[in-house]
Amino acid sequence: MAVKIRLKRFGKMRAPYYRIVVMDSRAKRDGRAIEEIGKYHPTEEPSYIEVASERAQYWLSVGAQPSEQVAAILKITGDWQKFKGLPGQEGTLKTKGEKEAFVAPEKGSVIIPEAITKKASKSEAAEAEAETTEAE
């Protein structure tokens, strides 16, 4: 049985999410997988990549062939270099930086918060109409 490591598509139209799976090469793209070893979300910035390195190393060692896309992902995470014994095993994976916590401006600050206009009450609206009719 020829085993491949490839992507299994999830998500909606124009919003793909993929799982990195090990499956028989004759199975359908979204068919039954032998094992799920990672996730790939290409629409996020930077792309979200999560690979169970130990399991990827195991499947590569027993002869599973990665697809072109998965091979590129494994090179980014450094798993391919680790398997082949090449330099650069730390990978080039970029992660999101943590956002700073919101800090409200102090009372003596020069920053003026945006004004929130309240809706006019019914009586004020009626007075405004009366003034416009009197002016005519």
From Swiss-Prot:
Keywords: Ribonucleoprotein, Ribosomal protein. GO terms for molecular function: structural constituent of ribosome. It comes from the Bacteria. GO terms for cellular component: cytoplasm; small ribosomal subunit. One of its GO terms (biological process) is translation. InterPro entries: Ribosomal_bS16, Ribosomal_bS16_CS, Ribosomal_bS16_dom_sf. The keyword Ribosomal protein applies. Belongs to the bacterial ribosomal protein bS16 family. PANTHER family: 30S RIBOSOMAL PROTEIN S16 (PTHR12919), SMALL RIBOSOMAL SUBUNIT PROTEIN BS16M (PTHR12919:SF20). HAMAP family: Ribosomal_bS16 (MF_00385). This is Small ribosomal subunit protein bS16. It comes from Pseudarthrobacter chlorophenolicus (strain ATCC 700700 / DSM 12829 / CIP 107037 / JCM 12360 / KCTC 9906 / NCIMB 13794 / A6).
